[in-house]
């Protein structure tokens, strides 16, 4: 049996959706702030819903938007997914904005939710935040592939990599062909390098067959389709039963 953890992308900014994912027994949810207009006000109730259902929450932020790191971390979200990592400088940028000194230079405010609005011991808050917070660094292009060895060398302890197959396929001149042998081979190369270095790596798929393929490959975590896609497919299949 695979030990892969399975999560779903959340595009619909309603806490009930987060709770439903938790009730379904999935391992985590990924709130997508990159490909949706979701902002910090919409994120807050989603964070509360995830905590209520003891569901791990990942937030994917837009590319190189400094304020998003602060907004998400200050709401007490431990896992941030950063897209379009192509160079060591991109890794260093993500680390800088995700952690407090001495690891990074994240903006420090004690009067935020993550610090109990000023009621956590400040030294304990800083140390515990650095220990608890994690990064998921998203590789999704040929430039990132070309620099993968140096990127892996720069990955901080506790961070992981994620392979975005759709953007990777596009960068290879095969837009949308995420099962093309060249795309899969490129993904496998990253996976093998991560395994050698004992770095967790995840990927995305949008079919049950894809989940089976990558889970059998031993991928530590798989991000699947989206909440709305699941609903539409389930509703469509229901309609087919009465035709």
Report the location of each language-model feature.
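Active-site mouth loops of central-metabolism enzymes
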Residues: 2-15, 58-60, 134-147, 200-206
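Alpha-helix-loop-beta-strand connector modules within alpha/beta enzyme cores
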Residues: 40-74, 98-105, 127-131, 179-202, ...
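Conserved anion-binding
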Residues: 67, 79-156, 165-167
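C-terminal helical cap(s) of enzyme catalytic domains, especially alpha/beta-barrels
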Residues: 46, 50, 88-104, 215, ...
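Glycine-rich phosphate-binding active-site loops on the catalytic face of alpha/beta enzymes
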Residues: 79-93, 161-170, 219-238
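Conserved N-terminal beta1-alpha1 strand-loop-helix module at the mouth
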Residues: 1-64, 96, 153-159
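Conserved beta-strand positions in the central sheet of alpha/beta enzyme cores
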Residues: 29-30, 58, 81, 162, ...
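Catalytic cores of alpha/beta
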Residues: 19, 23, 59, 64-78, ...
